[in-house]
Curated annotation (Swiss-Prot):
Molecular-function annotations in GO: alanine racemase activity; pyridoxal phosphate binding
Protein name: Alanine racemase
Domain of life: Bacteria
This protein's pathway: Amino-acid biosynthesis; D-alanine biosynthesis; D-alanine from L-alanine: step 1/1
Sites bearing N6-(pyridoxal phosphate)lysine, chain numbering: 35
Species for this entry: Variovorax paradoxus (strain S110)
Active-site residues annotated for this sequence: 35, 254
EC number from the UniProt entry: 5.1.1.1
Residue runs in coiled coils: none
One Pfam assignment: Ala_racemase_N
Length: 366
C-alpha cells in the first residue's frame, strides 16, 4: 500500500470560486489564470471546474498546448508573451493571444511571416516595475504594433502591485488611464485582489483572477477566504502512523526544540517537507486531526510531523490528518493561508510546492 498522503482537488469549489469572481467582475469577461500548472493543482484536474471561464491565461506554450489538448477552443493568453521568435509560429497554429511587454517582442512580430494576424495584449509598467512599457513609451509601442500586418486587435493591460494592501491601486490606475485614454483596445487591469477589493474602479473588458479561483484570500490576513465566500479547492491530507506518550521534560524530533511541560500524547503524521509541507512550520502551526483543530509540535522532518493529540484523545493509528483544506470527517476547513502564515510565506507557494511524490485525486463524487 502507498503512503496515506493525498492531495484532493474539489471541482465544485473551483466552479463556486469562478462564479464568485464573475459576480465581482460585473460585466467583464473572465480569464481563468492557470499558470504554474494551475497553481499546483494540475491543468487537467481543474479544467472541468474552470471551463465556464471566457478564456484561460497561462505562462508558456507547453501549458497552452495542454489546454488546447483538452478541447478548449476559446481564447488562450500567454501572460509573459513569447520568449523566442520561433514561438510565434506555434502561437499561430494554436490560435493564441499573447502579451507584448518589450521592444524585442515587437521586433519578433515584425519579422514573423504569417497569413493570420495575431491578437496581442500590450502591457504597461504602471508602477510594479517588472514587465511592460513605461507610460511615456506606451503610445509609441501601440502605434508601432498597430502598423504591423502581423497584428490583429491590440488590447491594453497592466498589473497592480498593491491591490491587496493599504496603498491600493489609485496611483497605478491614474498612470494607466492617463497614458491610454486616447488608445483603442479592450482593457484588462484587475487581478484577484483588484477584482474583489476594487471592482468599481477597475471595471474593464477582462479580469484576471488567479489565487481566488483556488480558494485563497488575496489579502490575507486582513480578510480570510470565508470573508470573500471562497471555498478551498485543494485538500492535503494524510493519516497518523504512530502514537507516543510523553512525560514532563521529554523532547520531540530533531533539535529537541519542543519540550513537554507535562504528560502529553502526540501523533506522528505521514507528511514532511519532501511532500511540500513547509519546513519553516513549527510548534503551533494549525492542523486538523479527525476534523478537530489542534497544533503541530516540534520540527517538520523529511517524511513526518508530530501533532498534539490533547483535543482529540480518540485519535489512533490511521486517523485522518488534514494539513490544509476540508476535513473529510467533519467538513471543517483549515485555510491554507493560515498554514502559510505559520511558515512565513503565502498560500500560492504551498499550492505550487506540493511534491511530485504526492498523489492527486478528485473529491468523492466529482
Amino acid at each position: 500500500m502507498p503512503r496515506p498522503i493525498l492531495a484532493t482537488v474539489h471541482t465544485a469549489a473551483l466552479r463556486h470560486n469562478l462564479d464568485r469572481a464573475r459576480r465581482a467582475a460585473v460585466d467583464a469577461r473572465v480569464w481563468a489564470v492557470v499558470k504554474a500548472n494551475a497553481y499546483g493543482h494540475g491543468i487537467e484536474r481543474v479544467y472541468e471546474g474552470l471551463r465556464g471561464a471566457d478564456g484561460f491565461a497561462l505562462l508558456d506554450l507547453a501549458e497552452a498546448e495542454r489546454v488546447r489538448a483538452l478541447g478548449w477552443r476559446g481564447p488562450v493568453l500567454l501572460l509573459e508573451g513569447v520568449f523566442d521568435a520561433r514561438d510565434l509560429e506555434l502561437c499561430s497554429r494554436l490560435d493564441l493571444w499573447h502579451t507584448v511587454h518589450c521592444d524585442e517582442q515587437i521586433d519578433m512580430l515584425a519579422a514573423h511571416k504569417t497569413l493570420k494576424p495575431q491578437r496581442v495584449f500590450l502591457k504597461m509598467n504602471s508602477g510594479m516595475n517588472r514587465l511592460g512599457f513605461a507610460p511615456e513609451r506606451f503610445g509609441s509601442a501601440w502605434t508601432r504594433l498597430n502598423a504591423l500586418p502581423q497584428v490583429d486587435e491590440i488590447s491594453l493591460m497592466t498589473h497592480f502591485s498593491d491591490a491587496d494592501g493599504a496603498r491600493g491601486i489609485a496611483h497605478q490606475l491614474e498612470v494607466f488611464e492617463r497614458a491610454t485614454h486616447d488608445l483603442l483596445g479592450e482593457r484588462s487591469i484587475a487581478n484577484s485582489a483588484a477584482t474583489l477589493r476594487h471592482a468599481r474602479q477597475t471595471r474593464g473588458d477582462w479580469v484576471r483572477p488567479g489565487i481566488v479561483l483556488y480558494g485563497s484570500a488575496p489579502d490575507f490576513p486582513e480578510h480570510d477566504a470565508a470573508h470573500w465566500q471562497l471555498q478551498p479547492t485543494m485538500t492535503l491530507s494524510t493519516k497518523l502512523i504512530g502514537i507516543q506518550t510523553l512525560k514532563a521534560g521529554d523532547t520531540i524530533g530533531y533539535g529537541s526544540n519542543f519540550t513537554a511541560e507535562g504528560p502529553l500524547t502526540i501523533g506522528v503524521a505521514a507528511v514532511g517537507y519532501a511532500d511540500g509541507y513547509p519546513r519553516h512550520c513549527n510548534t503551533g502551526t494549525p492542523v486538523l486531526v479527525n476534523g478537530v483543530r489542534t497544533r503541530m509540535v516540534g520540527r517538520v522532518s523529511m517524511d513526518m510531523i508530530t501533532v498534539d493529540l490533547t483535543p482529540v484523545p480518540e485519535a489512533k493509528f490511521g486517523t485522518e490528518v488534514t494539513l490544509w483544506g476540508r476535513s473529510a470527517v467533519s467538513g471543517a476547513v483549515l485555510p491554507i493561508d493560515e498554514v502559510a502564515q505559520a511558515a512565513g510565506t503565502v498560500g500560492y507557494e504551498l499550492m505550487c510546492a506540493v511534491a511530485p511524490r504526492v498523489p492527486f485525486a478528485p473529491a468523492d463524487g466529482e
